[in-house]
């Protein structure tokens, strides 16, 4: 009996064109299982099938939460627009730019938030949000590149978390899949999620 061919959420060429598979020249032990190969120039290439599978898992996981109880955090410039669009579509909360220390741990702060899940763009750059979420027992979902540690990350989405087009397609797919799970219309294009140059 022939094994059924895997069906991607988008054609694999769309993933490749967006550069989701482009890792870094550093590989952590945590990310080893998500590496497809290493190029001759030393660049690690991420496995797009594992990304596709994790997008499905993350969409199911996030769709279980009340939208307003999902907090997205992204310091990286190219993640601002995709995070804002995801939040508009899904109805989640977000913080782009600087994450104020104490946002998740200090009820005296005016910026204090009480999410039930935190979704960070990069656990290295957004480490303050990750450590605060961990300290108060909030699960963490993170986009992780080949150089990221997944310590304190409960659900890894293995992808290029730096590229403008890569971020657009990943957040677009997550928003689309969550909308599909919730039975909501989704009329946005990938370009709607893409940061300006």
Curated annotation (Swiss-Prot):
The keyword Ribonucleoprotein belongs to this UniProt entry's keyword annotation: yes
Gene Ontology cellular-component terms listed: small ribosomal subunit
InterPro entries named in the record: Ribosomal_uS2, Ribosomal_uS2_arc, Ribosomal_uS2_bac/mit/plastid, Ribosomal_uS2_CS, Ribosomal_uS2_euk/arc, Ribosomal_uS2_flav_dom_sf
One BP term from GO: translation
GO molecular function: structural constituent of ribosome
Residues spanning the signal sequence: none
Cross-referenced PANTHER family: 40S RIBOSOMAL PROTEIN SA
The protein's name in its UniProt record: Small ribosomal subunit protein uS2
